[in-house]
Amino acid sequence: DLIVVDSVAALVTQQEIEDATIKVVMGAEKKSHIVSDKDKKVTAYHEAGHAIVSYFLPTQDPVHQISIIQRGMAAGYTMYLPVDEKGHTSKNQLSEQICSLLGGRAAEQLTQDDVCTGASNDIERATSLARQMITKFGMSDRLGLVTYGHDNNEVFLGRDFSSTPNYSEKTAAAIDEEIEAVVMKQYAKALE
């Protein structure tokens, strides 16, 4: 439940609901933090990169809002508006989601001939998605319809946290190569 505390209005407006949602999801605005014009520009290009790349990807949701206001740990954000509920996610949708995540880094590279640390969370999320595609969803032509590794989402008392992978070092290297190939293919697509 969202409660508007700062307003004395009798009715809650749509804007107040949206502002409260953004505050909960992205964190409070950092009003006391002074951001240089250079950092604002880098963030603007980065967030625009996400939006532009997403616009050209048919499986991605439309952009709802872009902000370069720092909130939480983020220098800015691009928020999407889901068109419909997604029960199943295709390989193409996941690949395009990775491409969209890397759109910010691509925009930095194209506009500044340099990159910065602002894309670290995007890269982490893109890598995680690619890893799931390869090791969990069987979406690798090279490695086939096999699940690799243990489900790390389930924690039980007494579980052996130092358990070894259920595959060889050769397979581990192949998994790493496949993950890198997926991410780099989508980065190349974002740069286009």
Segments (PLM) and residue ranges:
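Soluble catalytic regions of large protease machineries
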Residues: K40-Y45, A51-E192
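Generic detector of well-ordered alpha-helical packing
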Residues: S7, E47-A48
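P-loop NTPase motor core
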Residues: D1-E16
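C-terminal helical "lid" subdomain and adjoining coupling/linker elements of P-loop NTPases
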Residues: I17-D19, K23-V42, F137-L145
